[in-house]
């Protein structure tokens, strides 16, 4: 039942493309303003990012650092928020300049001059200091399953710190100012 809204959102992109094609071929006589609006919201990063982030934030609700039961309310909300974000297309953005706004929309605190090249956590429990650099493929999810427990924690990255590509920052990680985490590391 939780997947019905997610699949509806996913289908909205295809339906928009079909309606646009039908309009261009003269099969339908629809409002151009409505089609352009649907195209911007469902088919471009300018619409997908806010729809995905704000929807995920509403589904997720308030999540605090802690240990929760697997399959419990927090786990299901977190899972559903991740599915919503993926279905919106926000996780497939190739526009790197939209990654920081996506992170902020999810609740992360991002400082000035941050070089952010990876997807932010849906938990919103991320703080990145000014001038920090996060290279591609860094896992900032801030949660993991261990048996029957879901561990959720904040990830904090200090000013001018650098996180190498494909590194994993576990829940509760704090990277201090000017620190350098080598590529492929787990902290």
Name each region found by the language model.
Residues 103-105, 109-187:
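Structural signal for interior beta-strand "rungs" in well-ordered beta-sheet cores
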Residues 1-107:
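Terminal amphipathic alpha-helical/low-complexity segments used for targeting or macromolecular assembly
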